[in-house]
Amino acid sequence: MPINAELHCHNSFSNFHVGDDEPPYDCDVSIRDQLERSHNLGLDAIFVTNHNTLDGYRQLLEYKNDHAKFKNINVFPAEEITTDTGAHVLAYGIHDVISPGLSLEEVIDEVKKQGGVSSAPHPFSLLDALRGGAKKCDMVEVFNSNNVDILSNARATEFALDNNMIQVAGSDSHVLSTLGRCVNVLMIFYLL
């Protein structure tokens, strides 16, 4: 059964520090607004990938469960983890926070221990990118709607093809208007 899924988005619980002396700020999208837009776009699933926290996922799931209007939107746990080099890794299906500041290898190991799946977001963006380290992830984000240069997504696609990796797209939504900009059609199989 195919589902339309948003694989890379943030809400007001995202915890990204610009500098050590700065308070965390990443986006101001509310839980209600995130679900409302997902509903209006006809999304079947949303993976909340807040920076360095699972907060926002739990609150989104609770709000969804309290409002019948959103009952058909599946909400899944995920996190965007900042490695020791500043590069990011997306972790899907985890249930415990993976602390920032770990090496890429440590992050990947922890994702696997939790039974999750890893993805390299914006692997060839101008700043804080995994580049060749993306090979260690399960998937590669070949299209990130926030990449400002035209070559980053093309390089990510070429990299994924050369390394025979699963390709996904991400809205990387930090504002409400970009939620659902990149939707992945996933095939879900139910085991009896």
What are these regions (language model features)?
Residues M1-I3, G42-A45, K69-V75, Q114-G116, ...:
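Short, well-ordered coil/turn segments that N-cap beta-strands
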Residues D28, L54, V97-E105, D109-R131:
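Divalent metal-binding pocket/active-site signature
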Residues L7, T49, E79, P121, ...:
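Active-site flanking residues adjacent to catalytic metal/cofactor-binding acidic residues
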Residues F47, P77, S119, M139-E141, ...:
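Structural recognition of the beta-strand scaffold that forms the well-ordered cores
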Residues L61-A68, E105-S119, A156-N163:
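Surface-exposed amphipathic alpha-helices with a cationic face
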